[in-house]
């Protein structure tokens, strides 16, 4: 008993409350394995094979991130990629909690993506790696198109590049020193004029 008191009241399992908090924090995230690739390192005795994993995680409430991990075994590569993604989270503002505020484009290397806001009920119209990003982010309605490189790494990075360039009405209003209601009334007035033409 004296030994247990010296260690701060923790038993042999350790962790206690800290471990429980960490597990709760981890359980709020949804993770998707986007791509797994076999890689080789050439050493003096020949080739040493391993695996590289690309993982996207998010809380489905506007936070998402991606990570890359390499290891000799697949589960370890996925674990490393997930840890990397948790350190690399990005917050994205969503309109009505379901779609983007406006159309945006992003690029990385030879990969380009175009993302369009969509009305309710459209669903996620996107392929492969982009779909995983939107599902973990919590986007329910979006139309996405990729042009150029279909490399999953480039597509995920290009998608996050596009999402970083999105502006919410609140941030635009703050930049222009006007109220959000003024900005939205101008937008509605502009839409009515365009429809009349």
Swiss-Prot record:
Keywords of the record: Ribonucleoprotein, Ribosomal protein, RNA-binding, rRNA-binding
PROSITE patterns: RIBOSOMAL_S5, S5_DSRBD
Statement: the UniProt record of this protein carries the keyword RNA-binding: yes
Matching InterPro entries: Ribosomal_Su5_D2-typ_SF, Ribosomal_uS5, Ribosomal_uS5_bac-type, Ribosomal_uS5_C, Ribosomal_uS5_N, Ribosomal_uS5_N_CS, Ribsml_uS5_D2-typ_fold_subgr
GO molecular function annotation: rRNA binding; structural constituent of ribosome
Source taxon at top rank: Bacteria
Gene Ontology CC terms: cytosolic small ribosomal subunit
Disordered, as annotated region: 1-27
Classification via Gene3D superfamilies: 3.30.160.20, 3.30.230.10
Subunit-level organization: Part of the 30S ribosomal subunit. Contacts proteins S4 and S8.
Domain notes: The N-terminal domain interacts with the head of the 30S subunit; the C-terminal domain interacts with the body and contacts protein S4. The interaction surface between S4 and S5 is involved in control of translational fidelity.
Primary role: With S4 and S12 plays an important role in translational accuracy.
Protein name (database record): Small ribosomal subunit protein uS5
Organism from which the protein derives: Bradyrhizobium diazoefficiens (strain JCM 10833 / BCRC 13528 / IAM 13628 / NBRC 14792 / USDA 110)
Name of the gene encoding the protein in the UniProt record: rpsE
């Amino acid at each position: 008993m004296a030994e247990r008191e010296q260690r701060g009241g923790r038993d042999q399992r350790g962790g206690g409350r800290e471990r429980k908090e960490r597990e709760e924090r981890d359980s709020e995230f949804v993770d998707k394995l986007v791509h797994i690739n076999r890689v080789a390192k050439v050493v003096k005795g020949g080739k040493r094979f391993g695996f590289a994993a690309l993982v996207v995680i998010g809380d489905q409430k506007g936070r998402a991130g991606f990570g890359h991990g390499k290891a000799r075994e697949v589960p370890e590569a996925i674990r490393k990629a997930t840890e990397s993604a948790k350190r690399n989270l990005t917050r994205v503002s969503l309109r009505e909690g379901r779609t983007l505020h406006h159309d945006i484009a992003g690029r990385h290397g030879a990969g380009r993506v175009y993302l369009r806001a969509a009305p309710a009920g459209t669903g996620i119209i996107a392929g492969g790696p982009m779909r995983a990003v939107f599902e973990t982010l919590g986007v329910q309605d979006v139309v996405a198109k990729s042009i150029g490189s279909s490399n999953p790494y480039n597509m995920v990075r290009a998608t996050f590049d596009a999402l970083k360039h999105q502006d919410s009405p609140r941030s635009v209003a703050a930049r222009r020193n006007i109220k959000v209601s003024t900005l939205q009334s101008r937008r509605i007035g502009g839409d009515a004029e365009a429809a009349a033409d």
